[in-house]
Structures are given as structure tokens and as C-alpha cells.
A protein has these predicted regions:
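Short intrinsically disordered terminal tails
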Residues: 1-4, 104-107
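Active-site scaffold of zinc-dependent metalloenzymes
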Residues: 5-61, 75-94, 99
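Active-site recognition of the HExxH zinc-binding catalytic motif
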Residues: 63-75
Length: 107
């Protein structure tokens, strides 16, 4: 039986679409980070961008991307739970786990 890699890499997109909006994802060098220093990622619903710090390891970058993606989806749905950081963090973490542990179905 073939070994299944449980730690697959999640590709961070340059852009994707939600509700007809193009969402741009930028991986930003720390020297150009314009957000609070404690933040490692930021969703901006005004200009439809997700910024991620480039000093993160692969797994942390994936988790932060998924966290900001959850904010983006919830904001596009106009759902107030987007302001609940604990919910968004848990959802983003579980989403990252699911996306990096898929075992593909043969067709």
C-alpha cells in the first residue's frame, strides 16, 4: 500500500474570485508591511486584498491564508461572525487541515 503524505503543500493563489470580485493575494516583505506589527495577515474588504507576511513558514502561511480567506468569504456574505476572531481562527485552521490532507479519489 502506498504511503499517503499527510502534509501536502497548499498553493497560495495570487488571486481568486468571490461574488464577482477579484481578490488579490500579496505576500509582503516585512520591511514593507503596512499593517499592525502583531498581524501576520490582513484582509482588506475595501480593495479586496489579502496581505500575508513573507517571513512565515509554510504551514503558518497556509493557516494565515485560510484565516484571511474565511474573513473574505464571511464579509462577502455580509455575515457579522467575521468579527469573531476565535471563530475565524478555528474555522481557518480546520480549513487548512482539510485542504492539506485530501486523499484523492481515483476516477
Amino acid at each position: 500500500m502506498a504511503r499517503v503524505d499527510r502534509h501536502k503543500r497548499l498553493a497560495i493563489p495570487r488571486q481568486f474570485h468571490l461574488h464577482g470580485h477579484r481578490i488579490t493575494v500579496r505576500i509582503v516583505p516585512l520591511a514593507k508591511w503596512r499593517h499592525p506589527k502583531v498581524a501576520v495577515g490582513m484582509w482588506d474588504p475595501t480593495d479586496h486584498t489579502i496581505d500575508l507576511r513573507n517571513d512565515l513558514g509554510d504551514t503558518e502561511l497556509q493557516q494565515v491564508f485560510c484565516h484571511e480567506l474565511v474573513h473574505a468569504v464571511l464579509d462577502e456574505m455580509k455575515h457579522k461572525i467575521s468579527y469573531d476572531e476565535k471563530f475565524v481562527d478555528n474555522f481557518g485552521s480546520l480549513l487548512q487541515q482539510a485542504l492539506t490532507s485530501f486523499d484523492s479519489n481515483p476516477r
